[in-house]
């Protein structure tokens, strides 16, 4: 799977935009607040060793309410609307998504790539006048239709990937996706044809598949991430694209707040770590340094099969050697 994803060039990225800079300390301070009678000055003067201790204690006791005070805002770019629909099901979060009605930026990238490939002089931005816009849309439609009809599989893929996420299993067929990539291009051609004939964008978009790329800004807190999002979405049971996103996000968060996210992972890892006196890093499970003791994971995978299942889950975005120990 990892090789096919790399070959596909998914074009999906996760970028951390903002976060609670001293989030680890704030989690520890909030944990002390719930138990200590000390004044605020003493609580805020917590040392690094105490930060480590309080984070560990809240994790072991599954007392995650203090973790809600560490918040993360990130942008996912290039994901499909299939994946974005799964993402927004996580309700303890805030979302702002690229408008499907007012923006056709990803589609235009594909159209311009098609224009370039066939040597058609197309405007990079349609003119402001109605006639100018319709003329540009006609050219986009013609270029995309020709690409769908006349180009080989690799050329079609290079154009379609600008606007659509193409599943690796489809690419692995070796026949250009058995007409799928061609269908993507034809849908984009029809979309621009409709616009050139005066259709509204809000209506023309009905022809487009859910594979269309989008962009979304998400804000979540550490508790939602470690208790809900990562256990569900880093697991092999998750659909491959959102699993890819979850592992990319985990890598980003592990860099800025390793003491909070080193024990995070799919549901098998979260369960194992909450059973242990001392939790272990996700990397140590991946490398087989630590072994699972649970008879089966929450997804009913038997004990002996859990390590392989975890490695399969990580194959969409594996960490480097020694990363996040």
Curated annotation (Swiss-Prot):
Pathway recorded for this protein: Pyrimidine metabolism; dTTP biosynthesis
Sites where the protein binds FAD: 65, 89-91, 97, 221-223
Sequence positions that bind dUMP: 86-89, 97-101, 205, 233
Domain ThyX, first and last residues per copy: 12-267
EC number of the protein: 2.1.1.148
Source organism superkingdom: Archaea
Cofactor binding, per record: Binds 4 FAD per tetramer. Each FAD binding site is formed by three monomers.
One protein family per Pfam: Thy1
Residue segments, region Insert: 110-159
Catalysed reactions, semicolon-separated: dUMP + (6R)-5,10-methylene-5,6,7,8-tetrahydrofolate + NADPH + H(+) = dTMP + (6S)-5,6,7,8-tetrahydrofolate + NADP(+)
Principal EC category: transferase
InterPro entries named among the record's database cross-references: Thymidylate_synthase_ThyX, Thymidylate_synthase_ThyX_sf
Any GO MF annotation of the entry: NADPH binding
CDD domains: ThyX
Alphabetical UniProt keywords: FAD, Flavoprotein, Methyltransferase, NADP, Nucleotide biosynthesis, Transferase
Motif ThyX motif location, chain numbering: 89-99
Cofactor(s) the protein needs: FAD
Catalytic residue list: 233 (involved in ionization of n3 of dump, leading to its activation)
SUPFAM superfamilies, alphabetized: Thymidylate synthase-complementing protein Thy1 (SSF69796)
GO terms under biological process: dTMP biosynthetic process; dTTP biosynthetic process; methylation
Coiled coil as UniProt keyword: no
Function: Catalyzes the reductive methylation of 2'-deoxyuridine-5'-monophosphate (dUMP) to 2'-deoxythymidine-5'-monophosphate (dTMP) while utilizing 5,10-methylenetetrahydrofolate (mTHF) as the methyl donor, and NADPH and FADH(2) as the reductant.
Assembly mode: Homotetramer.
PANTHER family: FLAVIN-DEPENDENT THYMIDYLATE SYNTHASE
Similarity comment: Belongs to the thymidylate synthase ThyX family.
Protein name listed in UniProt: Flavin-dependent thymidylate synthase
């Amino acid at each position: 799977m990892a090789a096919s994803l790399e070959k596909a060039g998914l074009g999906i990225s996760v970028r951390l935009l903002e976060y609670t800079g001293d989030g680890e300390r704030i989690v520890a301070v909030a944990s002390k607040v719930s138990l200590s009678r000390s004044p605020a000055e003493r609580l805020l003067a917590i040392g690094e060793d105490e930060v480590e201790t309080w984070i560990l204690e809240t994790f072991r006791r599954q007392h995650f309410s203090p973790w809600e005070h560490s918040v993360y805002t990130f942008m996912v770019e290039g994901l499909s609307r299939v994946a974005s629909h799964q993402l927004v099901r996580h309700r303890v979060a805030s979302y702002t998504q690229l408008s499907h009605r007012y923006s056709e930026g990803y589609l235009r990238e594909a159209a311009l790539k098609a224009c370039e490939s066939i040597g058609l002089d197309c405007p990079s931005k349609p003119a402001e006048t109605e006639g100018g816009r319709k003329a540009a849309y006609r050219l986009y439609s013609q270029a995309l239709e020709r690409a769908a009809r006349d180009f080989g599989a690799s050329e079609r893929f290079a154009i379609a990937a600008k606007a659509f996420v193409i599943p690796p299993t489809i690419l692995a067929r070796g026949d250009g996706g058995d007409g799928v990539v061609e269908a993507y291009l034809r849908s984009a051609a029809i979309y621009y044809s409709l616009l050139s004939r005066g259709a509204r964008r809000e209506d023309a978009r009905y022809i487009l598949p859910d594979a269309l790329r989008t962009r979304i800004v998400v804000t979540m807190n550490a508790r939602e991430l470690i208790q809900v999002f990562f256990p569900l979405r880093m697991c092999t049971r998750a659909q491959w694209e959102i699993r890819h996103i979850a592992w990319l996000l985990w890598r980003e968060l592990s860099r800025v707040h390793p003491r909070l996210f080193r024990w995070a992972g799919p549901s098998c890892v979260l369960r194992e770590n909450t059973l242990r006196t001392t939790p272990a890093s996700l990397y140590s499970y991946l490398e087989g340094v630590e072994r699972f003791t649970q008879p089966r994971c929450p997804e009913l995978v038997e004990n002996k099969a859990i390590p392989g299942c975890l490695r399969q889950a990580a194959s969409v975005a594996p960490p480097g050697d020694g990363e996040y120990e």
